[in-house]
Amino acid sequence: MDRYDMEDVVVAPPAECSSPLKEWRLKRQAGTLDRSDIIEFLKRESPKYFDYQTSATVKDTNVITLKCMFKESLAKEEIIDVVVEFMLGDNPSSALEKLRLEGNTATVCGKVFKNGEPTYSCRECGVDPTCVLCVNCFKRSAHRFHKYKMSTSGGGGCCDCGDDEAWKKDQYCELHLANRKNPLESKILTDAVLERVEICFGAILAFCVSYLEIEPNASLQCLDGNVEGGQVDGAQYCTVLYNDESHTFDQVIQTLTKIAKCRAKDAMEIVAAIDREGRAVVKCDTFEECNKLKVSIENQMILPTSLVSTARNNQSLRTSVLHIGAVACQQFALQLLGWFQEFLVRHYLFRKTFSELVQRKQETFCIRHILEYDVKLWKTARTCWHRLLISGMLMEYDNKMILAQEFSRRYATIVEDFISDDHDHAFSIVSLSVQLFTVPSIAHHLIAHEGIFDKLLHTFYHVAIEKFIRNKTLHFSKNIASLTFFKRANYILYDLRYLLSLKPDVLSNDLRNGFLEGCRALMRVLNVMQGMESMTRQTGQHMDYEPEWECAFNLHIKLATTISQVIDWASGDVKLLRKLYKMTMRALVSNSFIVGGEKVMQPKKVADHVANCLVYDISVQPVSIHLPLSRFFAGIYLHLGAHDLTYDGLQTETEALSIKLTPREIIEPVLCTQAMIAQVGAGLWRRNGYTLLHQLYFYRNVRCRVEMLDRDIACLQIGASLMESNEFLIHVLNRFNTIPWLQENYWSLLSGNEMNDDIIREASIFDEFLELLIVIIGERWMPGVSMVTEEDRLRKEIIQLLCIKPYSHSELSRALPDGNSGNSDNVFEEVINTVAVFKKPVGADSKGVYELKEHLLKEFNMYFYHYTKEDKSKAEELQRERRKAKKQLVCCPPPMLPKLTPAFTPMANILQCPVFLNICSLIMERALNAYSRSFTESHLQKVLHLLGYAIQEELSEHYPFLSFYERSQEYGILEKLEELARCPRLEAHYDFVLWTIERFKQLQAKQAPSDGRAGPSCSQQGTGGKLSLSAEEQAREERENRARLAAERRAHIMAQMQKAQKSFISSNAEMFADTENETRKESASTGPMDWEDIPPEEEQGAVALESKVACLGPDRKFYHGTDDTFKCILCFENCAISRGGRQLVSSAFVQTSRVIFTTPNLRNSQSALHISCCGHVMHYSCWLEYFTNEEFKELRRPHRNRAALAQAANVEFQCPYCRTLSNAIIPVTETLPAFSAPPSPNESYLPLDSFVEIMSTLAIELGNVKDHELTTLPSVSNILRLSGVVGGLAQFERSVQLIKNPPRLHADYIEGIEFLKKALLNTMKIQQSHLKDHPAIESIEMVPILWDSCSYTLQALEIYLYAVEKPLKAELSMRHQSCARNLVRACSRSSALEWETDLPLLPPMRSQAEFSSRLLDTIFNQNDTSVLEWDCFRVLVPFQFGVLNLMVPEKGYKTIIPSGSMFDFYIMQTMFLAQLTKAVLCFDVEKEKAKRAEKAPNSELTQLDYIEQLPSRIRDNMIDFYRRYNIPARVLQKTKQKQLVEEESEENQGHGQTVVIPCESHHLALLLEYVQRQMSSFLRCSCLFYRFLTDVDFPDTFPTDQPDRFDLMCQYLGLDPMLGVYFDMETVYATMMHSFASHPHIDREVEQRCQPDARRSLQVEPCLRPLPRLKVLCDDFSDLINSVSDIFCPNNEREEMKTPTMCLICGLILCGQSYCCQPELGKVSVGACTHHAHACGAEVGIFLRIRDCQVVYLGRGKGCFVPPPYLDEYGETDMGLRRGNPLRLSQAAYRKIYLQWLGHGLHGEIARLNDNANVAAAAQWHHM
């Protein structure tokens, strides 16, 4: 247990002289028992169970380690159990069991959620999103089959199962449904028992209140020296440090280490305990010492860590000095409250008693007191009281109502306390509001009878905004948004949202009156918000500083939902609506922003119509984005029509109350805002800074637009419906200041001048005016404006969004405003399914998207008011492409409009009024005037859009008064359109003009029968003949003609170019002839070997010959060819690999790895080095210059946010070309066979047995020389002589391919290799230094480290290829191919070290000789590990590179470069035989039979025919070898032999029979199949290795889409695929296999297996290592999150893990929370995950943060978040569970993570994501 958590420690019980139980019973009988008796008992007993220990550290006696503990289990036995026994009688456990069987627990679950616990809400049945279920109830309820959401609790809430008001149906789970049937009475809880219960409950409550409230006066009480009998002088006091949310962990740790003299580790544990519990004891000593520490801590000056400091931030840490007795009583009180909460759940009568007690106002523990003193408590104490109230008061409705009433009455006080406090909202009593205000009946009761609506807003007004009101308007000061008090005050608005979340069906008079009282308070808030943060246009100079704007928008965002809810409530009740309308009008009249004060009017004339306009110049007078009062009026007005209320009817009532407001005054503030937005677009407000741009962005943003932009448009539509159309348009034109712009004579004066800025601005503003007019007329999908529903409005919004692009589900839901109802998700899904088709995701990286149904594309509106400019551009382009593809007119015509409601019908008149027609006519005239300077094409496009609306409105016949066609004739609209169609300058709008004319013709045809006068003149008829109803066909024909002419023009130009080209060739014939000859020569001879054409009849034979390509052995194919040419990625110079040229290198990345060791084996700490590279080539000198610069930049980089472990072993840099993470280089060299001359066909070589003898002799010779005497290598001629190879030096030299006078290694090459080796060594040092039992750094062998890295890298590549199902012949990526090729070549070249015979051995060569000596001794002389312990491929590589170059003849300058010589083949054969032997030894016939029966019971053995065809001699040898050496067979034989001996001894028979293990042909066939399977990985690795060593490509016979075949791989390696050959006793093969199989270690292993209890000493390396896998995850994410809901932190058994994190490599669950679990890694404290990653993944790990549904890649002090493998039904991730959709495991997404890990790409992915992330401060990943 953590010492600061007061955990249970069992000690002997204290001796008691008398029993308190007897005393209480006697007093009870006498009637003198009082609760004070029990309180005294609790007070007296609790200090006995508190203890502490102090100890000084060995290094520093001043550093004290303190350990405090409260023995909870003992306190329960000795105190709580005594009280329970008094209440329930002598056998309390029996009584409690009977109570449980009665089943009167509760019909409401009421489980209190802990932080991070999973919760479930039903989207179909939940009344609102706050209605949740716990795991147990959810699993037993019908909701698990519905559409549900899952999230994690912040702590403090409770389960709503059983609450009738929380669910529309299925209110009970199976468990709580049963409890409904149980009666509320109890036979066990008699009146006498309940009397005792009442006394005990009262005592418990009084004790807890008394002792948990002593904090403020704690130090003063201590001075009395009398607290619980303690003395001031004794060591009886504690200094207690409290939690606050203002100081950081690091600040508190620093204070503890500096002042309290704690160790850093102890300080971390204290801080973790303070964060968890809310306080911790930091010192136990005398009062004087404790007080001194308290004063020191309080006087400590802590600098603020953030730029914005809060008031609390500047205060000192909160401490107090308490008597130990007081601390003990407090600790026991916390335990008592926890027990009490659980006890109350046991029966209804317990809760009834509790409720009655806390309702007594004279008691110290009444509800009022508990609510008000919450702020004085620390975190744990608060949580205990909250849980007690939930369990005691929220289970029954009556109790809940009582608590809600008391909570409402004290609301203002507790909220003010919360605002001045610094604890999080979840730890405040205010957080109970969600439990109370979301119950509809309680919320409505509180509004009606407690005035809670008014009280909430009054409190908010008083605490949050009153102090910022100047001149009746809000003006927030700078940085107010970041002040804590304002953020905390906003929780009041959340409570208001809960309160109004469910609208009642019917409003009672009390509820209506209470609601109206709240609305008055709301009007007061909206009144001061009207015009807040107003701006005045800056002229002359830029603003000095950016004014505050965020706070106003935050206030709007928090209040917007409430405003929508209030309007929604009012919409359903005509009385409420009428009164609220009058209230709003009164507020508007009283507000003076823009329309207040003296109104100056001025007449304005347009098209012979005059209107009196309000004089207000927005260019010089204040304007504001914030007009909530005007917008609230618009929201209310839209609902009048539903109740047959009209503006005129209500106007009479308001005028009677002296409230008079004309429509033009209503719309004026909104018009000013729209005009200001237009001016901003024209660039007139650019000196007002970014503040204005930010505000305009949020004005249109989805979070704000419902109560901003949408309401503004509705307000203007109201104005358009109430005002005469011409007057309305003149008002709008006047406000945009564009009336002069419409005068023709005014613009004709300017037409001859050059364009200037003012004209451009005016044109831009008029453009904005036209767009606003389009929006006012067209955006009528609003209930109340048109005959549409909310679903229609949502449908329109979705259609317009999907016209931009296909959207994923989350993108679409984010692009739509939040609904107020709890089931808005269901509505959204119903609507989306009617308009779009869901395309499922393809692949791991894609999301599912919705695509708009084809027939709805015609509803696209280019000027949709929620489009940004970018959206508009994208949507228009997409629409044009679609129409072009369908061969329709390429334009974006306006959609059909819904019918207006009666109140808004006058708005349609705008489309036929003279001012409108005058504007349209004028724009078209200017469009036709080539010299007009006052026209832009955008004007024409918008006018055509408006005309389209007008035509379609008349065609719809919704409005009898609409006669657009007739009036348009007066202005010659059709004639102008036809002129536009003929105007070549306006070709871009040709199709739109044609569409408009076509619609006009439809209207004309409709009008013709009814009105003859409407027919056009003769000239018009003539034009109409040409432009008939088939205008679209004519347009298409014209487009095709234009396309044909363009194609002819292109063909003519191409013919001219070809003619010129032929002319040039003929004039330069000689030059082209030379080029052809060169090309012919190059193609004829590709190298030293000339390829001849193969006649058709010989082709078959050629293929057969080609199929036997081998890279090793006597039939080896010798490589001929040229190396590739490259381009240096730094200097871009073309370069080829040449011995005399500049050295080339490729950047590489070295990392420690355990990927292929993660399969279950005994070597848990085994790791290796892996090398990867991207393959891009550069000159060494270019790279060195680049690297030096990168190194310098790294040194200059600030290291503040990086821990010691973040410093990488090697300087990391990125490939200059592809930015791949690198920390080393690999030299690029030419092909290895190029160094050796091709052998002659008739040359002889030393045989395999001579090779074996030579190797054995070399091992002995090297072993005989002591290390310090090894100055020269043994003589080759001497070794040959001792091996019995007489006169074979020439053969030896041919067999090893000795190179005489080899080329010298380039100096840059040597430097490059040294750099690579240094990188490998550094990486290994860093990894091993962090291991607990790490070897000495000096013991790391430098020689084999490169070879071992090469073998591991190739093994990792082979496993990766196997995992992605790629055979060897399949095309390798450039990354893998270049890495393997360059690495193998580098190993081979560096192993051929140059040395002269007269020079002593250099240290590297000596180390190599020592290493080779041990290696050869192990392989050939059986002096170390056995073949069972070898990873044969990792032995093969160092054998290949480390041995042969030790045998260079003495005379001359010579070397051996491994490249596929005969000795290289023998090395391969040796290791092949070793692997074969191991496979035969490990074969278990019974297991193989069982596997075969399970997979394919009736399949035939493929090798059976081969076995039966073998000579009996070889078959007998195989049987003999199997019986003699196979380990399971030997164990079985010994076991049976032992049994036989025992049986014979019992029967007194002494025949001495020997048990013979059966081995038939089918056994041998099974064995060969097993061997082939077990050797597949070794052979694939070997093929890869020798492919790059010899540069002989895989033959075409290798499969490209099927698994690699054993026989083909053997042929490629020069081996005999017929395994029977190796069991011929007349060959050296059998001898070698017998040698491998007869190792003493193997005999010992057999003996140990015969004894089941014996400890195994042999670590068997499997022949075929199992494929590494990540942890298998649950298919359903809810199962995974539930599985960790009860896991406790390893450092604190009482505290559940806050952030359970699963290692996906091994499946271990770790605590991902900082500080509570901090082991040390290399003397640095790190997080549990970082520590685990070093052990489990060799410095890199993959972790799943379960409750956040996040995957973390964790590297060396760095990390990144990647998408988790859990996806919802729409193919999307949900990191943080924000959307809450049910998640299921996506195998494709998990496989992507798996392949990144298997392919060693985690470090690179971390670097890539961190480079791309825009993170200002680096996260401290090492603390994870």
Swiss-Prot record:
<dbReference type="GO" id="GO:0005737">
    <property type="term" value="C:cytoplasm"/>
</dbReference>
<comment type="similarity">
    <text>Belongs to the E3 ubiquitin-protein ligase UBR1-like family.</text>
</comment>
<dbReference type="InterPro" id="IPR042065">
    <property type="entry name" value="E3_ELL-like"/>
</dbReference>
<feature type="zinc finger region" description="UBR-type">
    <location>
        <begin position="107"/>
        <end position="178"/>
    </location>
</feature>
<dbReference type="Pfam" id="PF18995">
    <property type="entry name" value="PRT6_C"/>
</dbReference>
<comment type="function">
    <text>E3 ubiquitin-protein ligase which is a component of the N-end rule pathway. Recognizes and binds to proteins bearing specific N-terminal residues that are destabilizing according to the N-end rule, leading to their ubiquitination and subsequent degradation.</text>
</comment>
<keyword id="KW-0833">Ubl conjugation pathway</keyword>
<dbReference type="GO" id="GO:0016567">
    <property type="term" value="P:protein ubiquitination"/>
</dbReference>
<dbReference type="GO" id="GO:0061630">
    <property type="term" value="F:ubiquitin protein ligase activity"/>
</dbReference>
<dbReference type="InterPro" id="IPR044046">
    <property type="entry name" value="E3_ligase_UBR-like_C"/>
</dbReference>
<feature type="region of interest" description="Disordered">
    <location>
        <begin position="1006"/>
        <end position="1043"/>
    </location>
</feature>
<dbReference type="InterPro" id="IPR055194">
    <property type="entry name" value="UBR1-like_winged-helix"/>
</dbReference>
<dbReference type="InterPro" id="IPR014719">
    <property type="entry name" value="Ribosomal_bL12_C/ClpS-like"/>
</dbReference>
<dbReference type="Pfam" id="PF22960">
    <property type="entry name" value="UBR1-like_wing"/>
</dbReference>
<dbReference type="Pfam" id="PF02207">
    <property type="entry name" value="zf-UBR"/>
</dbReference>
<comment type="pathway">
    <text>Protein modification; protein ubiquitination.</text>
</comment>
<dbReference type="InterPro" id="IPR003126">
    <property type="entry name" value="Znf_UBR"/>
</dbReference>
<protein>
    <recommendedName>
        <fullName>E3 ubiquitin-protein ligase UBR1</fullName>
        <ecNumber>2.3.2.27</ecNumber>
    </recommendedName>
</protein>
<keyword id="KW-0862">Zinc</keyword>
<dbReference type="GO" id="GO:0004842">
    <property type="term" value="F:ubiquitin-protein transferase activity"/>
</dbReference>
<keyword id="KW-0479">Metal-binding</keyword>
<feature type="zinc finger region" description="RING-type; atypical">
    <location>
        <begin position="1126"/>
        <end position="1220"/>
    </location>
</feature>
<dbReference type="Pfam" id="PF02617">
    <property type="entry name" value="ClpS"/>
</dbReference>
<dbReference type="GO" id="GO:0000151">
    <property type="term" value="C:ubiquitin ligase complex"/>
</dbReference>
<dbReference type="GO" id="GO:0071596">
    <property type="term" value="P:ubiquitin-dependent protein catabolic process via the N-end rule pathway"/>
</dbReference>
<dbReference type="InterPro" id="IPR003769">
    <property type="entry name" value="ClpS_core"/>
</dbReference>
<keyword id="KW-0808">Transferase</keyword>
<dbReference type="InterPro" id="IPR039164">
    <property type="entry name" value="UBR1-like"/>
</dbReference>
<feature type="region of interest" description="Disordered">
    <location>
        <begin position="1073"/>
        <end position="1093"/>
    </location>
</feature>
<keyword id="KW-0863">Zinc-finger</keyword>
<dbReference type="InterPro" id="IPR036390">
    <property type="entry name" value="WH_DNA-bd_sf"/>
</dbReference>
<dbReference type="GO" id="GO:0008270">
    <property type="term" value="F:zinc ion binding"/>
</dbReference>
<feature type="compositionally biased region" description="Basic and acidic residues">
    <location>
        <begin position="1033"/>
        <end position="1043"/>
    </location>
</feature>
